[in-house]
Amino acid sequence: MTNIRKTHPLMKIINSSFIDLPTPSNISAWWNFGSLLGICLILQILTGLFLAMHYTSDTTTAFSSVTHICRDVNYGWIIRYLHANGASMFFICLYMHVGRGLYYGSYTFTETWNIGIILLFTVMATAFMGYVLPWGQMSFWGATVITNLLSAIPYIGTDLVQWIWGGFSVDKATLTRFFAFHFILPFVVLALAAVHLLFLHETGSNNPSGITSDSDKIPFHPYYTIKDILGALLLILVLTLLVLFSPDLLGDPDNYIPANPLSTPPHIKPEWYFLFAYAILRSIPNKLGGVLALVLSILILAIMPLLHTSKQRGMMFRPISQCLFWLLVADLLTLTWIGGQPVEHPYITIGQLASILYFMILLVLMPIASIIENNILKW
């Protein structure tokens, strides 16, 4: 009798994706982040669903409803903080996943890579709208500042902003629609993630060496299921420590002040995971230029396959490119730090230099380094 998992229409899909999937035998812990992102997404959808049962998307009651969740709902505080810090874990995993893709040349799977970029944009949009929902000071002013960036678009900008706001300022209509979008987008992300996997399984996984692994594959279960479970346990451990010991570590204290359109906070800044992009936006003294730089800071990933000049796929055996990659990581950490600082000397200059370096590394230095490495190896 044939095994049900190989014959049943539904089980067959699960089997070919998570059980009998032929996987390279040498993939490292950097390949764990895909499954961790899946866990983060499920966690966010579940905690978000329970929060939505008690949340009200009205400007007069939104802040109070979040307070009510934390004070009066059974385990409401833990659900709220799991959701808030779960977003931070989500982005840590996302950035490491993208970094892995850059380091090991996974962007040569162009379909998978492009769906990944769309996923990144969608998750960022979802997180931004979620940050507006508690209706604290940073929620309100963050929404005002970021949506206002669209007014930099020539000719249609102002109309576009007012259309998104549903009025002449961020108000009740804005909050209601942001809640609607924040609820629906994670399911869009779920569908896109399925497409992401579909494209990945067309080609099979990349591996640290960057060479084809067709001759050396092992089944996903039990080898990588056990490895993924270890990764998941570590993720849950870090998240639990964060939620139970310092739930507000990554948040902004200003968001505990109810939104007040008449009082601007001294430093408007987004959540920590957007600070690098915010620093790039602020480093350009022109509104439209800043918005373009902001979009390009992520969209630049789409041209990575075109900028790949090396004869090797990954960076495992390319020391010059490795140095540049880690310089890029340091640069992004610098931008993250600058994004949280006030707009004054010396932060302005540091931010501008870090922004220039970011684009320089990706567009100029890495392709040149690859050519140099090819020549050293006489390839």
Curated annotation (Swiss-Prot):
Alphabetical keyword list: Electron transport, Heme, Iron, Membrane, Metal-binding, Mitochondrion, Mitochondrion inner membrane, Respiratory chain, Transmembrane, Transmembrane helix, Transport, Ubiquinone
Residues that coordinate or bind heme b b566: H97, H196
Cofactor(s) needed by this chain: heme b
GO biological process, one term: mitochondrial electron transport, ubiquinol to cytochrome c
InterPro entries, per database record: Cyt_b/b6_C (IPR005798), Cyt_b/b6_C_sf (IPR036150), Cyt_b/b6_N (IPR005797), Cytb/b6-like_sf (IPR027387), Cytochrome_b (IPR030689), Cytochrome_b_C_euk/bac (IPR048260), Cytochrome_b_N_euk/bac (IPR048259), Di-haem_cyt_TM (IPR016174)
Cofactor: how and how many bound: Binds 2 heme b groups non-covalently.
Residues annotated as binding a ubiquinone: H201
Domain of life, per lineage: Eukaryota
Transmembrane residue ranges: 33-53, 77-98, 113-133, 178-198, 226-246, 288-308, 320-340, 347-367
Gene Ontology terms: cellular component: mitochondrial inner membrane; respiratory chain complex III
Family named by the database record: Belongs to the cytochrome b family.
Note from the entry: Heme 1 (or BL or b562) is low-potential and absorbs at about 562 nm, and heme 2 (or BH or b566) is high-potential and absorbs at about 566 nm.
Designated name of the protein: Cytochrome b
